[in-house]
């Protein structure tokens, strides 16, 4: 069983590796745990290595590989995932956590239809009060279970903020080859773009950079209970 600091360090290393493909520096690890010196990080890494959670890569400075994560780690811990801002009660009940602004729902994200091609909105929903009103938003109904380990379930209505850029690790609406839209986690590395599901049963899809266009970033969702 890992100590709290060992677990937190392991999850931080995993998060950095998944976001950038590069191990965090000892300084970054020290700061993440609010430690005063790097010697404590050295001890924690040695303990994680002895227990079989990480491995130091030979001939590479500061290179670590996460071999496994603790069984007590949640899906959010493992995937550094979007933590959904769920509007309780869904769309069928009066909710005080809403403001007067409404946004369009443009269809289903798993339908393979690019957002620009959807001319007629399906419905309108209130914009959650925690989101900035000056952004451009739209909703999409989720079909399928490819993002369940990020807390996104089939039947949810995801709220997307329009944007043509996104940081590594963000969940986005990605348009593939100008005709297929996907809700995936995006990671760019070199001359490739990876679109990751949050479900171990689905493979990561790899594309050239000219084949993928970001149409928006996931910011919230509605869920009917």
UniProtKB/Swiss-Prot annotation:
Family statement drawn from the similarity comment of this UniProt entry: Belongs to the peptidase S24 family.
InterPro entries cross-referenced by the UniProt entry: LexA, LexA-like, LexA/Signal_pep-like_sf, LexA_DNA-bd_dom, LexA_repressor, Peptidase_S24_LexA, Peptidase_S24_S26A/B/C, WH-like_DNA-bd_sf
Transmembrane annotation, as ranges: none
Entry protein name: LexA repressor
One MF term in the entry's GO annotations: DNA binding
Primary role: Represses a number of genes involved in the response to DNA damage (SOS response), including recA and lexA. In the presence of single-stranded DNA, RecA interacts with LexA causing an autocatalytic cleavage which disrupts the DNA-binding part of LexA, leading to derepression of the SOS regulon and eventually DNA repair.
Subunit structure as annotated in this protein's UniProt entry: Homodimer.
Active-site residues from the entry: 146 (for autocatalytic cleavage activity), 184 (for autocatalytic cleavage activity)
Record EC number: 3.4.21.88
DNA-binding feature ranges: 26-46
Presence of keyword Transcription regulation: yes
Keyword Repressor in record: yes
């Amino acid at each position: 069983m890992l100590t709290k600091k060992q677990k937190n360090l392991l999850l931080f290393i995993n998060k950095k590796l998944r976001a950038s493909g590069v191990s965090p520096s000892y300084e970054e690890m020290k700061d993440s745990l609010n430690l005063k010196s790097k010697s404590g990080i050295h001890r924690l890494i040695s303990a994680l290595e002895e227990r079989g959670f990480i491995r130091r890569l030979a001939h590479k400075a500061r290179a670590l590989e996460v071999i496994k994560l603790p069984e007590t780690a949640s899906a959010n811990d493992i995937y550094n995932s979007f933590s959904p801002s769920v509007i309780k009660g869904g769309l069928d009940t009066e909710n005080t956590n809403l403001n007067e602004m409404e946004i369009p729902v443009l269809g289903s994200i798993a339908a393979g239809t690019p957002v620009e091609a959807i001319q007629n909105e399906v419905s309108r929903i209130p914009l959650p009060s925690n989101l900035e009103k000056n952004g451009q938003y739209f909703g999409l109904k989720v079909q399928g279970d490819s993002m369940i380990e990020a807390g996104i379930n089939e039947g949810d209505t995801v709220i997307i903020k329009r944007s043509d850029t996104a940081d590594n690790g963000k969940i986005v609406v990605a348009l593939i080859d100008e005709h297929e839209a996907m809700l995936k986690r995006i990671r760019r590395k070199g001359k490739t773009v990876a679109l990751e599901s949050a479900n171990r049963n689905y493979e990561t899809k790899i594309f050239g950079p000219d084949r993928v266009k970001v149409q928006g970033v996931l910011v919230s969702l509605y869920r009917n209970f």
